[in-house]
């Protein structure tokens, strides 16, 4: 167990590598360590696009994710026995929330259909700025160049 934890700690301690940790428990030498899944690559690319769009306000977002991931591991992995995949998801959710707060002057876009196509899941219940009103839209994150989309046939 300590060997696996040491490998995991080394992996997450490298700058800008948090989103490179695989979501698959079957890949890598130890579960979730080593290989990059297709979903994770997509998630990493979305983060890159958002950072480019919202520069310079988000220039430290990767550093924030790394720092928070280590903090969450320390606080939750040991005390609450949260698995590293759950801890990773929690920190990614936190990062999207930071993006939301940093970019609140930007018009928010829904990428619900993109989420369905890629299989990449994003945090739910973001507040979306649209036509000068704040409205709640399940599954929304900012996505430059896309219109706000509501799928009327969605149950969730």
Curated annotation (Swiss-Prot):
Disulfide bonds: none
Principal place of residence: host cell
Keywords: Apoptosis, Host cytoplasm, Host-virus interaction, Inhibition of host innate immune response by virus, Inhibition of host RIG-I by virus, Inhibition of host RLR pathway by virus, Interferon antiviral system evasion, Viral immunoevasion
Any one annotated GO CC term: host cell cytoplasm
One Gene Ontology biological process: symbiont-mediated suppression of host cytoplasmic pattern recognition receptor signaling pathway via inhibition of RIG-I activity
Subcellular localization, as worded in the UniProt entry: Host cytoplasm
Superkingdom, taxonomy of origin: Viruses
Keyword presence, Membrane: no
Sequence similarity: Belongs to the pneumovirus non-structural protein 2 family.
Function in brief: Plays a major role in antagonizing the type I IFN-mediated antiviral response. May also inhibit viral transcription and RNA replication.
Protein name in UniProt: Non-structural protein 2
Record gene name: 1B
